[in-house]
Amino acid sequence: MKTWKTNLEETKQRYINWWNHKGIILSMWEHFQEGVKPHADIAPPAPARDLSQKWFDPQWRAEYLDWYVAHSSLMADMLPVANTQLGPGSLAAILGGVFEGGEDTIWIHPDPNFNDEIVFNPEHPNWLLHKELLKACKAKANGNYFVGMPDLMEGLDVLAALKGTDMVLLDTVMQPEVLEQQMQQINDIYFKVFDELYDIIREGDEMAFCYFSSWAPGKMSKLQSDISTMISQDDYRRFVQPFIREQCQKIDYTLYHLDGVGAMHHLPALLEIEELNAIQWTPGVGEPQGGSPKWYDLYKKILAGGKSVMACWVTLEELKPLLDHIGADGVHLEMDFHNEREVEQAMRIIEEYTGSSSSVSADVHTNQPVGEQDNAQESIRIREEKSQEEDRMKPLYDAIVAGKLEPAVEVTKDAIAAGVLPQDIINGYMITAMGEVGQRFQDGKAFVPQLLMAGRAMKGALELLKPLLAGNASATIGKIVIGTVKGDLHDIGKNLVASMLEGCGFEVINIGIDVTCDKFVEA
């Protein structure tokens, strides 16, 4: 392989060391072009006609990536890798998900015809596109750089892209055996797809991965389960860990992408996978980036567990304190570089380390006057009726907390027949039950599947009450406008919140992602 990276062999050796939990790698997530002397005289292609050409025209992308790599810095351990990703989790598109090109990324929407059957069609246009794109890039690269493996993803994340996150979370409760079968089917297809794409992009046995622009001397993959932030440790060990372990056993070099503080409780299960080589940490929105002291203990746990670590978006100011605290063995630094001067500063720093309630009785006797005794008797009667109502409605509360739809509906029917006011059913029992579920979630005793099941049970019961509330302001609990702010392209959490709010009786106006303030006000 003739390459534009002059120190490629040194970087390869550092990667081999890192996969074996030794040494430091100094790189960055992608590349920068500021002040970089081009490695070849390559002109960029004409601007893409539209988003479709920008993402889904293999020849245009191959020409663009050829120009991009030729003008990118390859200092330190930054690798020449063409980023061929077709959206996060593009295995879902191969299995029938729908592509949509955006300005900065590709979205994969659920398959409207998905019927829970996991089917690989070797003639599917999205599968053919993957192969055509990689072949076009490989031909254009001509040995000057690696063609990266697309971000296929796997498991629950792929299934969520096919049928919707909320439906997958419900499946963990409603059809767990079916879900396990689907996880195995997705894994089997993953290996088939991976191997065929590997044969296109490989350089001998070597390969690179588009995310983190990383390299290995054999097959390598980035593994993940972003949806795992919403499930319990028991569910993770049932629906995620066995299939991640199988990937680690069949792929030579594996890096797990641990995404967000909500996923940290799964670290023990990851460390149990002996074959897993390394763990990458992404703190998530609202958290300090990977070089923060907040994550030192996390990195130490990963390293102590026998895995190498990848820290992302580390700044120059954070670099030395980070290495002082976690050591200099098995550490992959994805720096926040902007120019080659910053790379040189980081290299000098690295050299320092590489060189060296109570019941009321009805027969109460008082000495009160007759009128006051009558009032007391009336109070007792009201309390008795309230107690009877509570006895009647307690099963509704229990059903919603347990996420049981049919019992919730039956109890609501009985309550309507007994004359219990719809407002009392909603305010006194449904909302109270959802409050209990929310508290359990906050305490770590329930997870998103349990929230969704409870919302589903309440929504089913609420449907019986809506006709009785027609024309009443209480027909819905309230109206909520939901969307992600301008610049935020994440919609999984937003859609889950919208689903749960609807289940609780709110009218939800979902205005989508990347929404300006004006559109929020207009809605």
Question: Where are the predicted features?
Answer:
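Glycine-/proline-rich flexible loop or hinge segments
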Residues: D41-W55, F114-F120, E436-F447
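Acidic, aromatic-enriched beta-alpha/helix-loop junctions
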Residues: S52-L65
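Extracytoplasmic/secretory soluble proteins
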Residues: A70, A92, G96, T105-H109, ...
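N-terminal accessory alpha/beta regions
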Residues: D77-G89, A93
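Aromatic- and acidic-residue-enriched carbohydrate-binding clefts of CAZyme catalytic domains
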Residues: V98-F114, A216-M230
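A gly/proline- and charged-residue-enriched helix-loop-helix capping module
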Residues: D104-E132
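Domain-level signal for soluble alpha/beta catalytic cores
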Residues: N367-A523
